[in-house]
């Protein structure tokens, strides 16, 4: 499976987020208290950008800024309505100090 570079780990401290694009898909990368997680940057309810939403680092959840749907960053599963479909997640690989994502 191909890997894409995101950034050095030192540039993504706890609570920070970053987006990268791969094949016209925006991917949100978040540092949840040292755990690096990646998911598609789109709410499954209406395609809103999740990167602009409120991040709960302790619970590893993000809230869509449009209608308040919350998503688990580990699984991509919606936790509250109006979203009911999960969003894609991506495996994260640490290569030295570089964060990389497995994409297909």
Language model features by range: what are they?
Residues 12-15:
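Solvent-exposed, conformationally flexible loop/turn segments
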Residues 1-2, 87:
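Short coil-to-beta-strand transition motifs
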Residues 17-104:
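Rieske [2Fe-2S] iron-sulfur-binding domain
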Residues 2-8:
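Short amphipathic
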């Amino acid at each position: 499976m191909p890997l894409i570079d995101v950034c050095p780990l030192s540039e993504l401290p706890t609570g920070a987020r970053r987006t990268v694009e791969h094949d016209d898909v925006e991917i949100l990368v978040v540092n949840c208290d040292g755990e690096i997680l990646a998911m598609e940057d789109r709410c499954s309810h209406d395609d809103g950008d999740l990167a602009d939403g409120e991040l709960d680092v302790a619970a590893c959840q993000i809230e869509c800024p449009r209608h308040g749907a919350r998503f688990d960053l580990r699984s991509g599963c919606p936790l509250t309505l109006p979203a009911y479909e999960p969003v894609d997640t991506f495996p994260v690989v640490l290569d030295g100090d570089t964060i990389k994502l497995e994409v297909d």
